Every structure is written in structure tokens, then in C-alpha cells.
Amino acid sequence: MTQVAHANSRLQEVLDKGVLRVGTTGDWNPMTMKDPATNSYRGFDIDVTTELAKDLGVKVEYVATDWKTLVNDITANKYDITGSASLNMSRAKVAGYSQPYFYLAFVPVVQKKDLAKFSDWADFDKPDVKVAATLGTVQEKMVKDFFPSAQHIVIEAPARDFQELLARRADVSVTSNVEAATLVEKFKQLAIVPVKEPRKPTPIAMLLPQDDQVWINYINHWVELKKTQGFFKQTAEKWGLKSM
């Protein structure tokens, strides 16, 4: 039984084909960023999955996806594994996860000139506040739960929620502390609201086919080994990332 399971596993398929297919969105700085001119990717996730492919002894192939189809594409066998994704139980109903290797939390981002109006989470739960979110992201459900009284602007990738904020069509977007730090550095008109504490501390892991325990076990062993050897810590530091 074990030999049959191994033979039918995605692990054996990857080894036989010599290619690891990785689903990535290319729009989460600094985790995964796509250069449209070259169609190449860079970021924390790219370093992680390149290392995984190297340890498997195979090539890596990046498959473009977006947040609303990230889980469906793993179940449809469009790729073998994803880059980093927030762990949530809705996704876990239909896809498997590796063990986590990074932790983040969520903060609100506003126009810097609006900091006088917004100082904590409760300030956004008002009928005259417009909250932006990207379809299919963890934040889409999160902001509806956080701010039921607010107006919700849900936009579809490749557009992003923070672009609504930049265009003044929204008052706030909620994103990870990771992305928020890169946004306020890139766009000087934006600021992170100094809330009392970030919300929803969340593990980050890779998505895998739910019914392939052999493949999940292999990836979990790899993650544990690399965590122990300091690989994830060093890679996070390279990209200016700080785990919660």
C-alpha cells in the first residue's frame, strides 16, 4: 500500500518529470513580484521554492495565478505547490497546507493626511468609511467581519486594494504587516495606522493537494529541516521581513 501511494504521489511525478510547478501571484511584495518585461519572478517565495527545487534535484517552473483561483488551481492540478499563503480554514477544507514557516498579522493603511481621523480599528466601522479589498484574498472576508457598518469596495486582480486607496476611491485597506511596510516605503503619501495591536496573527505556509499525504509529508520534512538550519530566517532577513 505504501509503495503504491508513493508511486502515485505528486512527489514521484515531480521527480519523474524533473520539474516542480509552483503557483504564484507575482503581486505580493516582497514575497513574490513579477517583472512584466521579462516575465520573471523574484522575492522571498521565489528563493524558497528555488531552494526546494534544488533539493529535489529538479527545475522550477512558475505558473501565474491570482488570489481568487489560487486554491482551485491547486485542486485542478495546474501546479504542484504554491508560494506563501495565509492559513485559513476555508482553504483548508479543499487544499492541504505545509507546516508554517512565517507568521504575520494585519494592519490598516490609510492616506497619511487621514491619520488625524483614524487611530484605531473601531474608527473604520462606520457607514461613511470606504474599505477596499481584493477579491479572493483573506482580507476580503476579514474586512467584512471587522467593519460590518462600512462600505466595501471589492476589486479584482490584477488591480489591488491599495490602488483604490491611492486613487482616493477608498479610505483604508487592510493588509499584512509585511506588505504594509513595503507600501508606505514606496508610496510616501500612505501610512500605517498606529493601532493598539495588529489583528489576526496568521501562519504562512504553502498550499498542496489535500489528498496526497506522501507529498505533504515530504514538504513538511523539508520545511522542518530548513527551519532548523536557519534557511527561512536568513531568507526573511534578505527581504527585510520580520516574522510576528
Task: List the predicted regions and their residue ranges.
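Ligand-binding clefts/hinges and TM-proximal coupling segments of bilobed small-molecule sensing domains
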Residues: S9, V138-H152, P194, V223-M244
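A ligand-binding cleft/hinge motif common to bilobed small-molecule-binding domains
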Residues: T69, A85-V94, M142-D145, L166-A167, ...
